[in-house]
Amino acid sequence: MGAPKQKWTQEEESALKSGVIKHGPGKWRTILKDPEFSGVLYLRSNVDLKDKWRNMSVMANGWGSREKSRLAVKRTFSLPKQEENSLALTNSLQSDEENVDATSGLQVSSNPPPRRPNVRLDSLIMEAIATLKEPGGCNKTTIGAYIEDQYHAPPDFKRLLSTKLKYLTSCGKLVKVKRKYRIPNSTPLSSHRRKGLGVFGGKQRTSSLPSPKTDIDEVNFQTRSQIDTEIARMKSMNVHEAAAVAAQAVAEAEAAMAEAEEAAKEAEAAEAEAEAAQAFAEEASKTLKGRNICKMMIRA
């Protein structure tokens, strides 16, 4: 085991990034066994590498090491950067103060964008898997890094992604093998890619990925006139109506967040069990090899 609570050095972080570039995320044991990195990471375990990479790649706020980790993941697959591709959050009613903030946050240029069709999160997942074309499929970290790199995702994107991946696997749209996801051969990729790619053009954005207060499958894109109409309707509400709508939105958000959190916990538990089983299998294999060598020596 590694040394817990020991601060990571810059040299160790660089070795971890180089190892991920060379072997891919999730190959912690392979990175530790690689002579190129074992001399630097000898104090670290596969769990240490996994936790450090997760902290580097999915920090909740700011750029910092999160942006550095994105650059490291980007080097594993060469993708053309879609300039200014972003998704702005479409918020539900929460309070009068938030309504005022939403008014300023959703303002667009003098030329209002045309009406755009609904965008599904599963289309973005299919786009990521089809574009990366990794052998054996893509893991959750790689898929999330691709979507976050190409579009602006909400803070709770990791939990939404875990829930959506679990749903797509259960309904047969994705196949999960060794914590990697791939698209079955019978699934038409062109329709998914058209849905994911056809709506992200131009510099001004009012679209969004699902947040806890929106449906996990679809988010409606609104034109400026629709936004103005909605704001006018909100201003005409009395205090009791606004409070009731806000309370309902908060309740729906809490329910969605609880469901997503439960799904994320189940996924993490399954991942931990798989790693434990892999470690046990390796130890059992070593023991069996040792016994076979002893038997051969006795027979000789």
Swiss-Prot record:
What domain of life does the UniProt record list for this protein's source?
Eukaryota
Entry keyword annotation includes Secreted: no
| InterPro entries noted in UniProt | Histone_H1/H5_H15, Homeodomain-like_sf, Myb_dom, SANT/Myb, SMH1-6, WH-like_DNA-bd_sf, WH_DNA-bd_sf
Q: Name one Pfam family in it.
A: Myb_DNA-binding
Annotated ranges, domain HTH myb-type: 1-58
Any coiled-coil ranges, and where?
241-290
- Residues annotated as DNA-binding are 28-57
* Gene3D superfamilies assigned: Homeodomain-like (1.10.10.60), Winged helix-like DNA-binding domain superfamily/Winged helix DNA-binding domain (1.10.10.10)
**Where in or outside the cell is it found?**
Nucleus; Nucleus, Nucleolus; Chromosome
All residue ranges annotated as the H15 domain in the record: 117-185
A GO-annotated cellular component: nucleosome
Q: Tell me the Gene Ontology biological-process terms attached to this UniProt entry.
A: nucleosome assembly; regulation of transcription by RNA polymerase II
Annotated region Disordered: where? 93-119, 185-213
> Mainly localized where?
nucleus
Q: What are the UniProt keywords, alphabetically?
A: Chromosome, Coiled coil, DNA-binding, Nucleus, Transcription, Transcription regulation
**Residue stretches spanning the membrane:** none
Tell me the GO molecular function terms: DNA-binding transcription factor activity; double-stranded telomeric DNA binding; promoter-specific chromatin binding; protein homodimerization activity; transcription cis-regulatory region binding
The record comments on the domains as follows:
HTH myb-type domain confers double-stranded telomeric DNA-binding while the H15 domain is involved in non-specific DNA-protein interaction and multimerization.
Subunit record text? Forms a homodimer and heterodimers with TRB2 or TRB3. Interacts with POT1b, TRB2 and TRB3 through its H15 domain.
The entry sums up its family as follows: Belongs to the histone H1/H5 family. SMH subfamily.
PANTHER family in the cross-refs: SINGLE MYB HISTONE 4, TELOMERE REPEAT-BINDING FACTOR 1
- Role description: Binds preferentially double-stranded telomeric repeats.
Protein name, please? Telomere repeat-binding factor 1
Report the source organism. Arabidopsis thaliana (Mouse-ear cress)
